[in-house]
Amino acid sequence: MKNHIKFLKRLKCIVPKHIKPKFHNDEELLAWNQEQGRLSSEAILRKNKAMKMQRILGRSGIRELYMNCSFENYHIEHEGHKKVVIASKEYAHNFNKNMASFIFSGKPGTGKNHLASAIGNYLILNGKSVLIVTVADLMSNIKSTFNGNNNVTEERLLNNLSNVDLLMIDEIGMQIESRYEKVIINQIVDRRSSSKRSTGMLSNLDYRGLKILLGERVIDRMRLGNSLWLTFNWDSYRKKIHGNEF
């Protein structure tokens, strides 16, 4: 820093008077230097945070398409959109206060995955463990434990699914209904609610359809505490997307 000050003094002597210097004294130069150091440190922190986020997201099951989803970049075109964004944001911000699960119900392409991913991204940035899995992948992983060569048992897999801070199960109702699928989802929801951990569900089915598919017991568990049920009852946004917009 002393060298910078000496250089500034020499520069003042040789610079023509009509040229206005950026710094008029040693204090201004010192302040600028400190500010540049602060900006550089913040840039490094942001880069490290982004790299960490990418690694965590890779393990969270959040698809690449949704990794940049936030509450701020959700397209709001009417009051329904505004309502679900506000409710989802409030859910994420109050996550630590009590156990609360959520169900996002509605047509495909209405923003359920966007807001579920926004919740997941927010919680991950705040140090929470998050996992999103489709029912198809969930059942595939469960069935893979039946293989005698697999080191992961069904019990261990269920424990892992029960221990993340927020588990989100996607595409409920997309599969051909099976009793075993219902039993597995029931076990997961039961274990998680018993340990006061939140679960999220995404489905194209309405309340009646989900109740028939999963049973009243599961739906009751999902509605414990300050749980959230949002209905996305508008047309698909994807119909309005052209070319590279998506």
From Swiss-Prot:
GO terms for molecular function: ATP binding; DNA binding; hydrolase activity. The record marks 69 as: Probably involved in the interaction with the DnaB protein. Coiled coil: none annotated. GO terms for biological process: DNA replication, synthesis of primer. InterPro entries: DNAC/IstB-like, IstB_ATP-bd, P-loop_NTPase. GO terms for cellular component: primosome complex. It catalyses: ATP + H2O = ADP + phosphate + H(+). Pfam families: IstB_IS21. Keywords: ATP-binding, DNA replication, DNA-binding, Hydrolase, Nucleotide-binding, Primosome. The keyword ATP-binding applies. Its EC number is 3.6.4.-. It is an enzyme of class 3 (hydrolase). Belongs to the DnaC family. The helix loader is a DnaB(6):DnaC(6) complex with a crack opening large enough to allow ssDNA into the central cavity. This is Replicative helicase loader DnaC.
